[in-house]
Amino acid sequence: MRSLRWPLAGVFGSLAMVIWSFEMPPPLAQILSDRMLSITPGALFGFLIDKLQLVGKPLFFLGTVGLEVVAGVVAALLLVPLARLRPPALLAAGAALGAVLAALARALLGGEAGAPSVVAGFLIYGVVTAAAGLLLGAALGEEASGRYGQPAQGRRRFLGMAAAAIGGVLAAGAALEIGRTLRGLGEHGSAAPAGPLEISDLVDLGEVADTHPGVVRGLPPASLTPALTPNRDFYVISKNFLDPVVDARSWSLRIQGPLVADPVTLSYEQLRALPSRSEYVTLECISNDVGGHLMSTARWTGVPLRDLLRHAGMRDAARWVAFTCADGYVESLPLEQALEPTTLVVYLMNGEPLPSKHGFPARIITTGRYGMKNPKWLRTIEPVQAPVEGFWEKQGWSTEALVKTTSRIDLPTEHQRVTPDLTFGGVAFAGTRGIKRVELSTDGGATWLPAELERPLSPYTWTLWYLTRQARRGSQVSALVRATDGTGAVQTAASTASYPAGSTGYDARRFSVD
């Protein structure tokens, strides 16, 4: 048992440090995960996204936490030669080890690894590991039988140390709970608008329902994907393992750089006071697989980006517009795209302030490009002469990120048992090109049947489609779907993965007819 003292110390010290680190801004595990993710080869990352989808990032993060624990065991073993030191000296040695780890992290990781909270975290990491070694040493009898004299005195000392340890754990738990509560309040507070919402800010759901019901005629309302996605159901993809929480009271948006004559700084209230417009826009993640659900539609309200650029006096030399965000994310758009009236700096989503996970207090929304080109938690806007290589581009993903034509079968669901009166339905999307036709095949693509199309909410959203036909009882039905965009180009049948420019191919479903 005595030989396990320091490895166990490393395990317990590491776990304590990992738990405590989640209350630091930013947590060490997040920095390590972000850094490791940024150096992961793009092809491997794309493969993992295709195969693991939404569970990939949590698994990656848990792996990083596991590495922290292993590092704690290694650190504890490094302290073994110092095991005979008195407690104050041992704790000092632990702090010294933490300082060495902090310096190594700064050299290897750079950036946020030099933040005071992280440096302090490494120092505490070493101290906690050393302290855990002392406690476990006493528990295993080494301290009780030797350094502290009589066994009874050793036991009393151990009980006192154990009580202190338990108290420390309880205090840490209480602090963690308080931190979570404060964080939750921060998220709630930051998601609230700077002032009361005006009636004109709200989506008129009745008007939306009148102009486009969002369900196929003659079908139950729950049968198809709604034309407008509720905020709670809107897909979420982020490079971060823990997203930033931004306080609207201290936030500002800056239009800056050498290519503007009059730099502008706007508060949240000032941004919301500017003339605005609303657009229905569908966003799709570039990592969305064929038939995947990383695609949603919302009504976005904000200030046209071109108005802000003109207000700042953008110079003629500008060719691109770059964005930086609260989480360190950078992205850029070609100038012609930035000047489109539909490219917005938005602050409302479906009539509500942007949820924190969707970029509160402001984000970019543009049309015809994958979600990576719509940065969240916006902080600065800067006209530039060349494109900025963003997070995804550095991993080999497409710089243009133009949406490809896609179509999806939502009804019936895969392997569902259906009646002979068979109804198919789903969505099709082609960015700014629109959808001209959707077709369904039940004979492997030999023949195609035209589907009925619902009128889209705007030229920039998906189109709902449906088709009814008779099927023979007891049969197995295999269905394929394809779409034709507004230019007349038919969706490609060639199947490709999402990396590096978006997936292609036909969505397919198989059903049993009762």
Predicted features and spans:
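Extracytosolic (periplasmic/ER-lumenal) interhelical loops and adjacent juxtamembrane/interface segments
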Residues: 29-52
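N-terminal secretory signal peptides and thylakoid transit peptides that target proteins
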Residues: 148-166
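N-terminal signal-anchor transmembrane alpha helix
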Residues: 4-25
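N-terminal secretory signal peptides
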Residues: 76, 80-153
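Juxtamembrane/interface segments at transmembrane-helix termini
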Residues: 135, 139-144, 174-189
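Hydrophobic alpha-helical transmembrane segments
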Residues: 57-80
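Structured, non-membrane catalytic/scaffold regions adjacent to prosthetic-group chemistry
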Residues: 23-26, 69, 112, 178-514
